């Protein structure tokens, strides 16, 4: 489950929403240079995601337990671990418009100055939203 929260940047004063985490059926990656986000659907990833689910000790998400159990029992492909999943999934994405790459381990950035989360504080006037 992902979330979106409002922040204020200490470095430049920009108010913005930052998203983190994917959902039950998609992953959310950030650009390693500017922090823009890119969603990638598990269906789009096809065999990459199926191989990852096959290698998990349990379901990817409780809400898709039955589907994941079927994948683990019936999918004929070789399982992959999390690191390989991330590497293969990242390779399917085009570069960001800024020239950076979308990565699972890249952090969100302030859209005003590209500062990292340690430079922000929660905006008391903004909402906090969870999504799947």
Give residue spans per PLM region.
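General detector of N-terminal leader/presequence modules that precede the first folded domain
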Residues: 1-24, 28-31
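Residues immediately within or flanking Cys/His clusters that coordinate Zn2+
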Residues: 4-6, 26-28, 90-95, 99, ...
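Short, intrinsically disordered terminal segments enriched in charged and Pro/Gly residues
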Residues: 5, 21-22, 37-92, 119-132
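Short cysteine-rich clusters marking metal-coordination/redox-active sites
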Residues: 9-12, 31-34, 94-98, 110-113
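Cys/His-rich microdomains that often coordinate metals
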Residues: 15-17, 37-38, 100-104, 116-119
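A general structural-boundary detector
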Residues: 18-21, 83, 97-100
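Cysteine-rich micro-motifs
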Residues: 24-37, 106-116
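Extended, compositionally biased low-complexity polar/Lys-Gly-rich tracts
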Residues: 91, 97-98, 105, 111-114, ...
């Amino acid at each position: 489950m992902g979330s979106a929260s409002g922040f204020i940047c200490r470095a430049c004063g920009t108010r913005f929403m930052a998203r983190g985490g994917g959902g039950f059926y998609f992953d959310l990656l950030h650009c390693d240079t500017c922090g823009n986000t890119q969603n990638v659907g598990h269906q789009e990833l096809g065999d990459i995601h199926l191989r990852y689910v096959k290698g998990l000790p349990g379901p990817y998400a409780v809400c898709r337990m039955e589907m994941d159990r079927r994948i683990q029992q019936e999918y004929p492909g070789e399982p992959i671990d999390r690191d390989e999943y991330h590497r293969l999934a990242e390779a399917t994405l085009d570069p960001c418009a800024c020239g950076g790459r979308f990565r699972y381990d890249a952090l969100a950035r302030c859209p005003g100055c590209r500062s990292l989360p340690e430079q922000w504080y929660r905006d008391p006037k903004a909402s906090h939203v969870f999504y799947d």
